Amino acid sequence: QRCKDCLYKLAIAVMNQWPGVRLRVTEAWDEDGHHPPGSLHYEGRAVDITTSDRDTKKYGLLAQLAVEAGFDWVHYESKYHVHCSVKA
């Protein structure tokens, strides 16, 4: 539930920051083993995100907005997405 609440706040922040752009979730809950053992994706507490326009120049600020939205851990994991997670 906390992850969902943070995503909701972040989606609003993204729309306010960049009109016409939306938050894009590329990975969330996972059951197919694409993440390392112990990944919070298996518990529904982690998401990988981008912007709908996939403008990588926005991802630094996207990460900052994710922190402000309440995510406990935010990591600009690759040039393709930002990883966010919440504590239990």
Swiss-Prot record:
GO terms for biological process: cell-cell signaling; proteolysis. It is found in: Cell membrane; Secreted, Extracellular space. The C-terminal domain displays an autoproteolysis activity and a cholesterol transferase activity. Both activities result in the cleavage of the full-length protein and covalent attachment of a cholesterol moiety to the C-terminal of the newly generated N-terminal fragment (N-product). This covalent modification appears to play an essential role in restricting the spatial distribution of the protein activity to the cell surface. The N-product is the active species in both local and long-range signaling, whereas the C-product has no signaling activity. InterPro entries: Hedgehog, Hedgehog_sig/DD-Pept_Zn-bd_sf, Hedgehog_Signaling, Hedgehog_signalling_dom. Ca(2+) 1 binds at residues 26-27. Ca(2+) 2 binds at residues 27, 30, 32. Zn(2+) binds at residues 41, 48, 83. GO terms for molecular function: metal ion binding; peptidase activity. GO terms for cellular component: extracellular region; plasma membrane. SUPFAM superfamilies: Hedgehog/DD-peptidase. Keywords: Autocatalytic cleavage, Calcium, Cell membrane, Developmental protein, Hydrolase, Membrane, Metal-binding, Protease, Secreted, Zinc. The desert hedgehog protein N-product binds calcium and zinc ions; this stabilizes the protein fold and is essential for protein-protein interactions mediated by this domain. Intercellular signal essential for a variety of patterning events during development. Belongs to the hedgehog family. This is Desert hedgehog protein. It comes from Danio rerio.
